[in-house]
Amino acid sequence: MFKTYTAAPASVEREWYVIDADGKTLGRLATEVARRLRGKHKPEFTPNIDTGDYVIVINADKIGVTGRKEQDKIYYHHTGYVGSMKSANFSQMQQRNPGRVLEIAVKGMLPKGPLGRAQLKKLKIYAGSEHEHSAQQPTALEI
């Protein structure tokens, strides 16, 4: 009789990946990042266990979108005060905080709850080409 393998949290081996976002499309990049963070690329993937890897994204300021989304895509947030709904389009968000656009896209693709928050903490985003995780010896990942 066959038994379904379930990964134990202690047995998960995590790797570090670095992705260069220069010239990449936002959605296609975000789906691959979310897939790596969840661990769906591994044969020992278990939905209720954090089996994902660490992902470093460099050159987040050079992420692109197709069509007219640079002006038409609007990001909203509310400060909590009455009448204080804030909005910014894609290009404004990229100027203010280059990594935030990718973070929002990936966050929407991860599970909601404590597991998704733990997986999102393994995402490291940098606007330039330098990152501070060279001690982990990340593997370059082409998308």
Curated annotation (Swiss-Prot):
Q: Which GO terms describe its biological process?
A: negative regulation of translation; translation
Q: Where does the sequence pass through the membrane?
A: none
Cross-referenced InterPro entries, in alphabetical order? Ribosomal_uL13, Ribosomal_uL13_bac-type, Ribosomal_uL13_CS, Ribosomal_uL13_sf
Keywords tagged on the record: Ribonucleoprotein, Ribosomal protein
**What would you give as a GO molecular function for this chain, any one?**
mRNA binding
Using the chain's own numbering, where are the disulfide bonds? none
Which top-rank group of organisms is this from? Bacteria
- Cellular component per GO, a single term: cytosolic large ribosomal subunit
The residue stretches assigned to a coiled coil in this entry are: none
Sequence similarity: Belongs to the universal ribosomal protein uL13 family.
- NCBIfam families found in the cross-reference section: rplM_bact (TIGR01066)
Assembly, in brief, is: Part of the 50S ribosomal subunit.
Q: Briefly state the protein's biological role.
A: This protein is one of the early assembly proteins of the 50S ribosomal subunit, although it is not seen to bind rRNA by itself. It is important during the early stages of 50S assembly.
Please report the name of this protein according to its UniProt entry: Large ribosomal subunit protein uL13
Species this chain originates from? Dichelobacter nodosus (strain VCS1703A)
